[in-house]
Swiss-Prot record:
It catalyses: a 1,2-diacyl-sn-glycero-3-phosphocholine + H2O = a 1-acyl-sn-glycero-3-phosphocholine + a fatty acid + H(+). Coiled coil: none annotated. The active site is at residues 63, 104. This is Acidic phospholipase A2 1. Homodimer. Binds 1 Ca(2+) ion per subunit. It is found in: Secreted. Its cofactor is Ca(2+). Changing residue 53 to T: In isozyme [Thr37]PLA2. Ca(2+) binds at residues 43, 45, 47, 64. InterPro entries: PLipase_A2, PLipase_A2_Asp_AS, PLipase_A2_dom, PLipase_A2_dom_sf, PLipase_A2_His_AS. Residues 1-16 form the signal peptide.
Amino acid sequence: MRTLWIMAVLLVGVDGGLWQFENMIIKVVKKSGILSYSAYGCYCGWGGRGKPKDATDRCCFVHDCCYGKVTGCNPKLGKYTYSWNNGDIVCEGDGPCKEVCECDRAAAICFRDNLDTYDRNKYWRYPASNCQEDSEPC
C-alpha cells in the first residue's frame, strides 16, 4: 500500500510523463498501470535489478532500458503528445519527449500482448531480495 500511496501523491496534479503512461496503459490494457504494474516482479516500478521474472516483467525491463536512452526529456515528468488512430497509439511531434512516448507506447503494447503471463499472486510486491541475480545488459 505504501508504494501505491507514494505513486498517487507523486501523480496528483501531474499531466505529463507517468500520468500519460498510466492513461495509455488504461486505454490499451484495460487496467490501471498503478494498481497492476507499479510493484510487479523485479522491474515494474521504481528501480530494477536481477532477471525479469516473466514476459510482463520483461516489458518493464525493456521500458527501463528505453528510458535510459532518452536524452533531453525527463521520462517521469516530460509531457508528450499522442493520439489514437484506429485503436493504435500514435506519438506525435518532433520534440525530445516523443522518445518517451515511444517507450511508453511500446510498454503498453507489450503489457497487452503478454497479459497471459501476468501473475499477480506470484509477482505482485515481489521481494527485492529475490532479484539479486546479475542484470542482463540493455
